[in-house]
Amino acid sequence: MSSSRPAHSSSSSSRTRQSSRARILAQTTLDAELNAEYEESGDSFDYSKLVEAQRSTPPEQQGRSGKVIAYLQHIQRGKLIQPFGCLLALDEKSFRVIAFSENAPEMLTTVSHAVPNVDDPPKLGIGTNVRSLFTDPGATALQKALGFADVSLLNPILVQCKTSGKPFYAIVHRATGCLVVDFEPVKPTEFPATAAGALQSYKLAAKAISKIQSLPGGSMEALCNTVVKEVFDLTGYDRVMAYKFHEDEHGEVFAEITKPGIEPYIGLHYPATDIPQAARFLFMKNKVRMICDCRARSVKIIEDEALSIDISLCGSTLRAPHSCHLKYMENMNSIASLVMAVVVNENEEDDEPEPEQPPQQQKKKRLWGLIVCHHESPRYVPFPLRYACEFLAQVFAVHVNKEFELEKQIREKNILRMQTMLSDMLFKESSPLSIVSGSPNIMDLVKCDGAALLYGDKVWRLQTAPTESQIRDIAFWLSEVHGDSTGLSTDSLQDAGYPGAASLGDMICGMAVAKITSKDILFWFRSHTAAEIKWGGAKHDPSDKDDNRRMHPRLSFKAFLEVVKTKSLPWSDYEMDAIHSLQLILRGTLNDASKPAQASGLDNQIGDLKLDGLAELQAVTSEMVRLMETATVPILAVDGNGLVNGWNQKVAELSGLRVDEAIGRHILTLVEDSSVSLVQRMLYLALQGREEKEVRFELKTHGSKRDDGPVILVVNACASRDLHDHVVGVCFVAQDMTVHKLVMDKFTRVEGDYKAIIHNPNPLIPPIFGADQFGWCSEWNAAMTKLTGWHRDEVVDKMLLGEVFNSSNASCLLKSKDAFVRLCIVINSALAGEEAEKASFGFFDRNEKYVECLLSVNRKVNADGVVTGVFCFIHVPSDDLQHALHVQQASEQTAQRKLKAFSYMRHAINKPLSGMLYSRETLKSTGLNEEQMRQVRVGDNCHRQLNKILADLDQDNITDKSSCLDLDMAEFVLQDVVVSAVSQVLIGCQAKGIRVACNLPERSMKQKVYGDGIRLQQIVSDFLFVSVKFSPAGGSVDISSKLTKNSIGENLHLIDFELRIKHRGAGVPAEILSQMYEEDNKEQSEEGFSLAVSRNLLRLMNGDIRHLREAGMSTFILTAELAAAPSAVGR
């Protein structure tokens, strides 16, 4: 379903992309119209009225392509810069000036009395060679940028003017046909000359990054509050906000911190037009935007007249803001601002990349929001601090992505749970009324303010819903206008063209519809968005009048309310998918209930599914066991209580503890005391489903290995799960790092020439690379060449972060921008002097093969203790370990597929069962005789038994007595139980010529008792089935029973029920009988598992099962405890 139009079969992600593109195009046109009106109107510009007028204008009348092009050209090529720096545009071939700002000659060539002997100062103009303006090495470094594909890696370049000796940060970016260089003065007192270099900027953000990384997941609010607090402390601005874009492109101040006395904007919503699409595009290109003084006069750019097109300033921080934005800032007393873009992965759920997919094919990016800083006086932030803020925003974006993933998992789980509950309610009553009148109901499926059901020409309403006549009118409109669609969703009935939208008022704006049949419809309703908006900490009464011509956040809030007064929150794709799923279930239920269902083939489907699933799982399990035993890496496993149940030969060899000695011991007794808390935490988290990676702990050694010291392992904890995705144990897949640590310790102790160690071809020397304090690659050993395919001379003296490792245009490609950010954090932590933990790391080698490894980073210091760079050690898991991890992943995927298959089968079976129920209910009203009614009752009982079995699919371990299998307490007749159970084996008896004889006392069998008759029927049918299966052809099965009444009070009696099933022949094989008594036997057969479940049910009834084997005869003796019905007590 798609917004404001009929449903289609396209995927959620494609619908999102289509609607997003449409919104962007529409807003860009509106932005251009507003800009043109502002330029023409001057002081008479009325922002509020124009937003409302443009919203009501038909799309075909909005804007003209000429206006849009002119607007975009004006934004990107405005030929004006801010005066806190100057700008040069250089021809890439000649290195000569082709454009410069009017203030550049004064800033770059003015002679200073502090610099003697400047006889002929250079002049700056069109055609000037830029080398004549600066001293070496700055001029050389600037020229070196010409050969870089991504020149931003070199920023900032520290240059010094020849005439004045003044230092500048040269910030380089590439535009069409030229290099554009921003020059910003350096204040040596605040940032000494040695501060140039991207890695130094990362150090400024180290504290803030650590704070963000230490946050527990699960709270977007806490994450946003933390980042605004850290930016506030880092930059010193008066106000810092986290500004979030919603799906319809409007914005909201999601988090905020201010200095005392400043009015907060927290909770304020802005129209989408407040931040034009052109500005958002520029934020995607240049992720930090600074305005130092909105009252300062802009500086013009002088260009070579031979240029065919104006210089693009998209990448320039100096680019002058639009006059409209400057007026907006001044009106809200925000004289200076700093804005960082928060760029996250596009939400394309159907296009999830594979783990080893090249980075060029990774997800697209989108602008989630902005981190906005305001100051009430002019403020300049030097480039190193701005770069630190940009990096902090990238780290924040990585965590926003993680929160999205977590929210998605929780959301899908909740929707699946609600769909299951609603499906069960539908199945029980075979009518959609149950999901309206019951609890939960359809309002619990998606967020809404009201809902309704039109079914059988009757209307049922829930909470805030239109009247019955209005719902019928909406249904008529749907049939007339959207008759061919299966549903509809819109955030505005008015915009969707419903003629009666005005009569519904503001409380009914958005609607989602699912048609069950042409006349039966489900509705969900939402109120207008303004009802969801709260002003947090407002001191200004929103009802007070503002000057509509004065652009201000308060006025934007008013404009937003005007825009959305007829709109609700939009219906998201996952909500529409949930509605569509319920729609399909309802259709299947009602369609199957309208005709007799065909039950043939049902048993075969279930049987095939079980057999296929068991065979596949057994094959994978066997492979896992074989791999674990023969792997050349240490692998150990524990059960839910921490007792060792897996200990392969490799870990036995390293520790000196044999397999038979380790099995059954608690894992905490086998690790060194210093590692007990680590392993305890790791085990606890893994049993909760949270798997820790790359944790280092030490294992005790025994026997001949005792004197060798502990075994140092780096371990991944892998939760072992059953078919129902429940954690039943933990597997530890490890790497022996003992030798690796010895090499590293030896390396770090060497004070002299370390090259002999780095470049030693000994296979024990791991791959090593390094960088100096400025980020240039300084080391690349032979093992690294073998691992990556890149030779030392191809990478040394290149930027480690950017040219050697990057998500694009690098020697070793990383699979995503997030991975690059994580690598930057690890390197930065080491440079800042922090003890860095081992981190998972991956890259594509020269042959585009993906390499997964562990990375440890150590800082390199000189004799004075000053950090001069970093050394990075790589440890690559063996092929056996990687294969074991892949097999484990395959096992988990297989279990997940089986779980989904069982879930599908349960829902698929419900529909034909509903049809069977309908057929029997119809037969009851056709005047059946007593025998025919008895057969119908047998069918009902079998139906209810199957319902119980399907519900058991949710149980974790149904063979365990402590499982949550439920027992009902209801009145039933024992004869009905036995007859229904016998009916389930009669076809098998006829095929083998087996006679079934029931020697049951009639009075006892017709007695009414209390208990779970359906579960008892299930038990009896299971034991009858195996008795018939293992009886010889032409044999017999005899059934007898005995009831013993025990009084436990004046009016309360318990009945000890005993049922014997005797059959001829060799009987049930001994191995199946033994499986019946084993609760956790991985080798259980289908019959053994079924009997184990039945025995568990009997034990829940305070009974049990015994088996007697005599000459040529076998007997099952079933016992259970029941309660006597009052009528039975009176007899």
Curated annotation (Swiss-Prot):
UniProt modification remark: Contains one covalently linked phytochromobilin chromophore.
Recorded superkingdom: Eukaryota
GO MF term (any one): phosphorelay sensor kinase activity
Annotated SMART domains: GAF, HATPase_c, HisKA, PAS
Domain Histidine kinase residues, every copy: 904-1124
UniProt domain PAS: residue ranges: 620-690, 750-834
Boundaries of every GAF domain copy: 219-404
Binding-site residues, phytochromobilin: C324
Record carries keyword Transcription regulation: yes
Gene Ontology biological process: detection of visible light; red, far-red light phototransduction; regulation of DNA-templated transcription
Record GO cellular component, one term: nucleus
Region entry Disordered, spans: 1-23
Keywords in alphabetical order: Chromophore, Photoreceptor protein, Receptor, Repeat, Sensory transduction, Transcription, Transcription regulation
Purpose of the protein: Regulatory photoreceptor which exists in two forms that are reversibly interconvertible by light: the Pr form that absorbs maximally in the red region of the spectrum and the Pfr form that absorbs maximally in the far-red region. Photoconversion of Pr to Pfr induces an array of morphogenic responses, whereas reconversion of Pfr to Pr cancels the induction of those responses. Pfr controls the expression of a number of nuclear genes including those encoding the small subunit of ribulose-bisphosphate carboxylase, chlorophyll A/B binding protein, protochlorophyllide reductase, rRNA, etc.
Assembly information from the UniProt record: Homodimer.
Family: Belongs to the phytochrome family.
Record protein name field: Phytochrome A
